[in-house]
């Protein structure tokens, strides 16, 4: 594959097969790009064909006998919050939010609490600062942090990549003690708001996995598009 920006060939490798971390009994295999020549312009193009970022590496599922991971994105100019999502926004009107490129100890402390209490049975447990930085940070594309505050207390963080045509939601985490606020939903809605303010065309939400309850929430934000073998298609769900 060549980048139009530099005409530099980009090597695409393939990982070994390993147990899937999302679906029991399935095996996972990834196409992986990890090159010094990667840049935000090329990454925006790779997002459009189903790739994602983890640290400085770009990957896309290429599993032997499974195609459950469906790339999903929101066309921002068409997105309208549902009644439930409007209630979430109204319920959290007392909170403030800000955009920053600064990484802080408070962000990591909240991440550590979130993983320990919400994902103690997953592959990201136990949390560590090294794992956190390797997962979220990228030398060729520093992430943006959307921070949500109750007064001076940090409640939630959305780690987001800012590209020329889109935003890409990398990871979100929040205070597990504030479950009634639906902070996970609030963070997606704030990313939609930011994308609209920045006149972006899409918000990429990663992979929709219908068979995994923890990964099936993304269809609640409509309209959305799913990447199929025929290209990006609007959902037919009413």
Swiss-Prot record:
Q: Which SUPFAM superfamilies match?
A: Acyl-CoA N-acyltransferases (Nat)
The alphabetical list of record keywords is: Acyltransferase, Cytoplasm, Transferase
As its record notes, the protein acts as a catalyst of: N-terminal L-glutamyl-[protein] + L-leucyl-tRNA(Leu) = N-terminal L-leucyl-L-glutamyl-[protein] + tRNA(Leu) + H(+); N-terminal L-aspartyl-[protein] + L-leucyl-tRNA(Leu) = N-terminal L-leucyl-L-aspartyl-[protein] + tRNA(Leu) + H(+)
GO biological process terms held by the UniProt record: ubiquitin-dependent protein catabolic process via the N-end rule pathway
Provide the protein's localization.
Cytoplasm
**Name of protein:** Aspartate/glutamate leucyltransferase
GO MF annotations, alphabetized: arginyl-tRNA--protein transferase activity; leucyl-tRNA--protein transferase activity
Q: Which Pfam families match?
A: ATE_C, ATE_N
